[in-house]
Regions:
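Short linear Ser/Thr-Pro motifs
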Residues: 8-10, 29, 96
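A short beta-strand-loop structural module common to alpha/beta enzyme folds
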Residues: 25-34
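A generic short alpha-helical patch detector that favors 3-5-residue windows
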Residues: 22-23, 150
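Short loop/helix-cap segments at secondary-structure boundaries that form the rim of catalytic
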Residues: 15-19, 36, 58-59
């Protein structure tokens, strides 16, 4: 296989890429991460994953580049990373005792080949009291996560169930990535 590059600064994505048990490099993409939430969100997040991969691929044309991005959607509102602690609290109140979708877009890019896709997982949250929300925000875990929670961290205790791929919620549907990388 050619050089493999992960175009992401996310420590969670690095953890998941490690599960492939294949050597890879990390080169952080400088792509603009804005999306137009008035468009089809799966298409938007797939396009963002493409932009991330393509930005890194331009200078690494001998490699296979994996780009990804994740959004949380509830009641047609896209929840990105919180701006501050108050924004994290607002998001957690929305998620509390509710169901939301997590969409992770992925692009695998090499010379002459593009595989751009997304995976969706439904997440069911338990009710969170104001005290629990404050305690969770005080842990600082929510501050760099889309939707203000980490399914693999302290946020796990608030999740009642999921429908779909757990790793999609973490930020990279690794089984799907592994399957698709076989054709590169």
């Amino acid at each position: 296989m050619q050089r493999l590059i992960l175009a992401s600064k996310s420590p969670r994505r690095r953890e998941l890429m490690d599960l492939l048990n294949k050597p890879y490099e990390v080169i952080v993409s400088e792509a603009d991460e804005s999306i137009d939430s008035s468009n089809d969100l799966r298409k938007e997040i797939e396009h963002l994953a493409y932009k991330k991969a393509e930005t890194v691929f331009k200078d690494n044309r001998d490699a296979v580049v994996v780009g990804a991005d994740t959004i949380v959607v509830i009641n047609n509102e896209v929840l990105g990373k919180p701006k501050d602690e108050d924004d994290a609290r607002r998001m957690l109140r929305l998620l509390s005792n509710n169901v939301h979708k997590v969409i992770t877009g992925v692009c695998i890019l090499s010379e002459g080949k593009i595989d751009n896709f997304s995976c969706v997982t439904k997440v069911y949250f338990n009710e969170m009291s104001e005290e629990e929300i404050d305690e969770y925000v005080a842990s600082f875990e929510p501050m760099d996560k889309a939707g203000s929670y980490a399914i693999q961290g302290f946020g796990a205790k608030y999740i009642r169930a999921i429908e779909g791929d757990y790793y999609t919620v973490m930020g990279l549907p690794i089984a799907e990535v592994y399957k698709r990388l076989k054709s590169f």
